[in-house]
């Protein structure tokens, strides 16, 4: 990817220290701009820190380590535990918003129960689960969360609306996941739509049949929605990168591409 020469001396503020924001900072710095990254959490990486928790995934943290090494060398100022105020943004010549996304919960009866948690909270250590867990959503996050739960000693069922579990998973990893599921007797419900959550079970429809799936806990892994940042009153050009841009960034490569693109437009 070609990094264009900068358009004069500019100060760029990056809001968000996930992979997209960090790549945007790298590219902006290489273009000769003064760059400040503001991350409200105490660590860089954003959702990578959650994605690295399931089995075999910790290697992806090397992407964060790379940016932690290269950005200071490029003169990028990193502000952890700090939110970018509108005053900070207006003091820059351009702002790149890279504030990520948040996980979704199904709007069905029982979804607000004490026995229901999100996969992101489970992986982040914010929610404790035990016993028989029903994971709603058999995509990448759902299957990886299921493996994590197996590692923690839980019994797991995976419920997926489509006709295949782990659709889109790497062909090198999928056989390992399926073997793990088989070894732990993971019940897989495909073509199954959840209609309600009750104490001790999930109600669902599989084809024309109404079924009941027993469980102690329900873990939601049904996708994400972009975060919004209030930029009303920000009077400098604002660009977007990563999940919050509305573009799907389901991989590190896509997040990097989004960060590069945003920084190259300034």
Task: Locate each region found by the language model.
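Rossmann-like dinucleotide/flavin-binding elements
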Residues: 5-40, 44, 79-87, 91, ...
């Amino acid at each position: 990817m070609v990094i264009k020469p900068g358009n004069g001396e500019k100060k760029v503020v990056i809001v968000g220290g996930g992979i997209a924001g960090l790549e945007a900072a790298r590219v902006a710095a290489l273009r000769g701009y003064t760059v400040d990254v503001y991350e409200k959490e105490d660590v860089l990486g954003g959702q990578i820190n959650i994605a690295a928790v399931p089995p075999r995934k910790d290697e992806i943290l090397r992407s964060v380590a790379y940016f932690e090494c290269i950005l200071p060398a490029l003169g990028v100022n990193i502000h952890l535990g700090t939110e970018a105020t509108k005053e900070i943004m207006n003091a820059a010549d351009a702002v790149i918003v890279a504030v990520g996304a948040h996980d979704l919960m199904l709007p069905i009866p029982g979804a607000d129960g004490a026995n229901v948690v999100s996969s992101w909270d489970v992986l982040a250590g914010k929610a404790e689960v035990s016993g028989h867990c029903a994971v709603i959503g058999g995509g990448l996050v759902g299957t990886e969360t299921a493996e994590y739960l197996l590692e923690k000693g839980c019994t797991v069922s995976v419920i997926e609306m489509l006709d295949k579990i782990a659709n889109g998973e790497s062909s090198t990893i999928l056989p390992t996941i399926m073997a793990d599921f088989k070894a732990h007797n993971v019940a897989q419900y495909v073509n199954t739509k959840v209609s309600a959550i009750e104490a001790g079970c999930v109600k669902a429809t599989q084809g024309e049949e109404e079924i009941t799936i027993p469980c102690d806990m329900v873990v939601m892994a049904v996708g994400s929605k972009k975060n919004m940042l209030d930029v009303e009153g920000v009077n400098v050009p604002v660009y977007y990168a990563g999940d919050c841009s509305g573009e799907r960034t389901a991989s590190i490569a896509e997040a990097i591409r989004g960060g590069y693109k945003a920084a190259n437009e300034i």
